[in-house]
Amino acid sequence: MAAGGGRAFAWQVFPPMPTCRVYGTVAHQDGHLLVLGGCGRAGLPLDTAETLDMGSHTWLALAPLPTARAGAAAVVLGKQVLVVGGVDEVQSPVAAVEAFLADEGRWERRATLPQAAMGVATVERDGMVYALGGMGPDTAPQAQVLVYEPRRDCWLSLPSMPTPCYGASTFLHGNKIYVLGGRQGKLPVTAFEAFDLETRTWTRHPSLPSRRAFAGCAMAEGSVFSLGGLQQPGPHNFYSRPHFVNTVEMFDLEHGSWTKLPRSLRMRDKRADFVVGSLGGNIVAIGGLGNQPCPLASVESFSLARRRWEVLPAMPTARCSCSSLQAGPRLFVIGGVAQGPSQAVEALCLRDGV
């Protein structure tokens, strides 16, 4: 499917992971795709660590994680990959922070989080790691904001988020970290807030127009997008239970307001728990769950220039609950759930002259 200007999307299929998994933690470092932890077929967190050499297309086993975990956050710091939080074998959030030293092929423990947490959002800026929110062992959402200083191996507290949450989407834009959505228990959060890294202050922006769980979020060209998800019942709709939607809501950072796009500009497929990203001026939505009895393979893109949705080549392996990672012109879709935990590793690529 053409993307304009002689560019097109295509899928690149990589060798499957040796270990099938869902909720794995992924990182891209020096031409290698690292997949760490996650849940396997038994439904328990793994300590398995594997890396795909992007040049030779071969998988290698790495030293196992000191702490088996799923749903952790990962940040690349030069030759190190920092793994933060997550959930352990007894389904309890962990405080453990560990660093994989790529040149030495081994793990080192780092200063732990002040509180155990899963669903922590992390952002790297100028060699510092910012950790926002999370859910603690008491299942309460957290508002904590921390910064990790690698040289001192310590976490420092910053002003708390106005809205506690876990599993939020975060975007670094200029000198601000934008935090969108997330959850409080089973309830989706509509808050949209920004932390100024220079003044270390929070700004509340207008909330999402609609309350949706498992929506997909992306930032592109000065706008933030919130797509699809499970619409929650409320006083302004006729549904008594959550239902899949194809909603598209866009926040313009310059004007500071949300726009709910009309029906003609909604996604073609209603979906939730899917992968979303930005490639070459297009917002892409991949896979997920919809009204069908099995995960979706469908893929579509919204062109910011032409303001319309287009159908893209289907994902080779239909999946939901995937890990994802963007590296240059590739959006990787890793693991997830098909019939069970998946080994699939595929990347949607934007190519010139295809």
UniProtKB/Swiss-Prot annotation:
Summary of the function given for this chain in its UniProt record: Involved in pinching off the separated nuclei at the cleavage furrow and in cytokinesis. Required for mitotic integrity and maintenance of chromosomal stability. Protects cells against mitotic errors, centrosomal amplification, micronucleus formation and aneuploidy. Plays a key role of midbody function involving abscission of the daughter cells during cytokinesis and appropriate chromosomal and nuclear segregation into the daughter cells.
The UniProt record lists the keyword Nucleotide-binding: no
Pfam families, per the entry: Kelch_1, Kelch_KLHDC2_KLHL20_DRC7
Cystine connections: none
Keyword DNA repair: no
Protein name: Kelch domain-containing protein 8B
Organism: Mus musculus
Sequence ranges of the Kelch repeats: 1-31, 32-79, 81-127, 128-175, 176-222, 224-281, 282-329, 331-354
SMART domains reported in the protein's UniProt record: Kelch
Gene label: Klhdc8b
Annotated Gene Ontology cellular component terms: cellularization cleavage furrow; cytoplasm; cytosol; intercellular bridge; midbody
Main location: cytoplasm
Keywords in alphabetical order: Cell cycle, Cell division, Cytoplasm, Kelch repeat, Repeat
